[in-house]
């Protein structure tokens, strides 16, 4: 029983360490990266260029990426700078 509990604990610990983030790619002006008029595989390519595992054009509007390294800045509603003057 002790080994089973230890195994489960290690399993959850590994899951937390390997976890990567996901979200919308950040464009040059602080907005989500637009994909409306881009080729079909544009978002998949852009996500792989920043180290993401996969990506797609969400609702034909913005690139959404999965398993992006922690060092990559993604668009966040809390820190949204899109359309704001500096």
UniProtKB/Swiss-Prot annotation:
The keyword Secreted applies. Residues 1-20 form the signal peptide. GO terms for cellular component: extracellular region. Pfam families: Toxin_3. Coiled coil: none annotated. GO terms for molecular function: sodium channel inhibitor activity; toxin activity. Its main location: secreted. This is Toxin To8. It comes from Tityus obscurus. The lineage of its organism: Eukaryota, Metazoa, Ecdysozoa, Arthropoda, Chelicerata.
């Amino acid at each position: 029983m002790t080994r089973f509990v230890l195994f489960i604990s290690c399993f959850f610990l590994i899951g937390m360490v390997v976890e990567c983030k996901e979200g919308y790619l950040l464009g040059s002006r602080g907005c989500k990266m637009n994909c409306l008029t881009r080729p079909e595989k544009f978002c998949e390519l852009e996500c792989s260029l920043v180290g993401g595992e996969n990506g797609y054009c969400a609702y034909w509007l913005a690139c959404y990426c999965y398993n992006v390294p922690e060092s990559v800045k993604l668009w966040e509603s809390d820190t949204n700078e899109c359309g704001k003057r500096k």
